Design a protein with these regions (language model features):
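Transmembrane alpha-helices and adjacent helix-loop boundaries
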Residues: 1-176
């Protein structure tokens, strides 16, 4: 009877960490994907403005984030966040933040691929109807991009569920 308590408690923690990290990763990934795609589509090359510079800067920061996070092992990220950045935080918070940041980089590329897969004419149609960039992206582009990106997002969720097994390295007792 006591063993089942350990298993169910571990399963609860695994599911909580996975779902919360998935939410953080989706929010972060969608925002980063929109920044990355905004840089490509908003203004002609000849147009120079402070906003254009800020978009280029934001795009460069997002590219650096994606490169660093995707190029670093998740265990290393977990240990750095636990022992260097969030030393006094609860272990479950550290796990959610770490896996959310990690998942955000992968989700950003998945969503960006979905957005780039939508025909350019869809953005032009929305803009020609007088919609702002954000409303065109939210109402026209993202629903189509999510449809094509859904299988890869499900794979990312499964990967995230498997990655929670390394939480034991920071002393979080979960399912594995």
């Amino acid at each position: 009877k006591d063993r089942w308590t350990y298993i169910t408690d571990g399963l609860k923690i695994t599911i909580i960490v996975t779902l919360l990290a998935l939410i953080v990763g989706l929010i972060l990934g969608i925002l980063i994907a929109m920044v990355r795609c905004t840089h490509d589509q908003t203004r002609p090359k000849w147009f120079r403005s402070p906003g254009n510079f800020l978009l280029k800067l934001a795009d460069a920061i997002c590219r650096l984030y994606i490169t660093v996070i995707r190029g670093t092992p998740t265990l290393v990220q977990l240990l750095i966040i636990n022992f260097v950045i969030l030393v006094s935080a609860q272990k479950i918070t550290v796990a959610v933040i770490t896996f959310g940041i990690n998942s955000g980089a992968y989700v950003a590329e998945i969503i960006r691929g979905g957005i780039m897969g939508v025909d350019k004419g869809q953005m032009e149609a929305g803009r020609s109807l007088g919609m702002s960039y954000v409303s065109t992206m939210k109402d026209i582009i993202l629903p189509q991009a999510m449809k094509s990106a859904l299988p890869a997002l499900i794979n990312e969720m499964i990967t995230l569920l498997k990655e929670t097994s390394i939480c034991g390295y920071i002393g979080l007792n979960e399912l594995t």
